[in-house]
Amino acid sequence: CGDCPSCRRGEEHLCTPGRGLGTVAPGGFADHVMVPHPRYLFDKGDVSDSLASTYACSGLTAYSALKKVGPLTEGDEVVLIGAGGVGMMALQIALAQGIQPIVVDIDENKLATAKELGAKAVFNSGDKTTVKQIKQLTGGVAYAAIDFVGAEASVNYGMACLRKGGKIIIVGLYGGALNIPLPFIPMSARIIQGTYVGSLQEMGELMELVRAGKIAPIRIEERPLDQVTQALADLKAGRVQGRVVLRG
């Protein structure tokens, strides 16, 4: 809207009235969109249209989540939970920024891909001993965990990986509830933070990295727009690696 406190702070993605296409307003699967102002346009350089479209969605979401981790010092470890499209994008962006995260998922194929791309280590969260293994690898516990699943089990897993004063950043929208004894929060000094997409400034920063060739492209699969129902079903079933791009 441009007028609410969030918009005035440059956080238009958190606009109080909200006008997001495909969420608040219809039009998420439209083949054309009217852009109301040039500030919403970004130079994609030589990147293909299909790949560039992923940066404005999963790319921006992953970049903003990583920024919320804040400055890291020697020995600070970051755990990425969920190696789907957004998680893989976060891995690529993290590597471009000199961060080598640990990746966690329940899919061995996705974990193998994450390891090939450069993850420091990968762990299957279906194995209940992996939290202990992460603690051994990190010399204690991790500083930050970013949860790209957003389920009760994944958040609890991330919390178990954190040291005192660490933070968990929740991106995923799977659902469920988190039951934590309130004294645990101040006594552990841990931070639980949500994040949703990202700001225009962050989008500009991300595209600078993209144009400079610092972010390796993730796997994308193009499908015609009339296959949207099947694409959503494949996403829900976990059959998609990387991102699906619909073409009208």
Residues covered by each model-derived region:
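Mid-domain Rossmann-like dinucleotide-binding core that forms the NAD(H)/NADP(H) cofactor-binding site
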Residues: 46-128, 132-133, 146
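Glycine-rich cofactor phosphate-binding loops and adjacent beta1-alpha1 units
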Residues: 70-74, 106, 112-191
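C-terminal hydrophobic helical "lid"/dimerization subdomain
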Residues: 108, 156-160, 200-248
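Rossmann-fold dehydrogenase core element
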Residues: 167-169, 179-219
